[in-house]
Amino acid sequence: MAIPYRRPQSTPEDGCAAYLDVIAGQGGVLLGALLLLDGRGRPLEFVHNRTEPPGGWMWPDELQFQACIAAVAHSLFDACRREPDLVVCKCTLGPRDYLRVEVGPSIPMVVVWPAADGAIQWDWVNDPPTHGMRSHSLAPELKTRGFLVEPFHRIVRGLQILYPTDLTKDETDDPVP
């Protein structure tokens, strides 16, 4: 016989945020990860991938990096089993226009970076969530609980464990934006 209990009301914790990061490793290798957390910071899924940039004299360095970021992001999106309500990324992945056009998630995406005073700033890459979307209340909840930057530390730790020969300490000294 089941024990009856009172179910909590729907809260922002019911939503899911996906933290996207791509880190340059040794020899030009790029390592990417997507960490999905609920509004309380509990991990739900971790998806990772690794790629080498296209080579040759026809590929300028900046185009190589941008092509790889989009390719890694898309492969992570395809491999993800859950459907997050929000994507959070660091400003190091590229300008907002690039992220909106080339990475192009159809769900709200926010980019984060540190301000001069140490506070974390954020800006919407595409349209911010509207009232009624779970991400509308999830995004402020993540900020209040301190989960705009901390998950990127988890991503780096995960990538270091999974790809120990591809990452050195120098490449992961400052894993936050």
Where are these regions (language model features)?
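N-terminal nucleophile
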Residues: 28-31, 89-96, 113
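C-terminal folded domains that constitute the principal catalytic or ligand-binding module
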Residues: 114-177
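N-terminal accessory regions of nucleic-acid-interacting proteins
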Residues: 1-4
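A glycine-rich, hydrophobic loop/mini-helix early in the fold
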Residues: 29-80
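Ordered, amphipathic secondary-structure segments that act as subunit-interaction surfaces
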Residues: 67-99
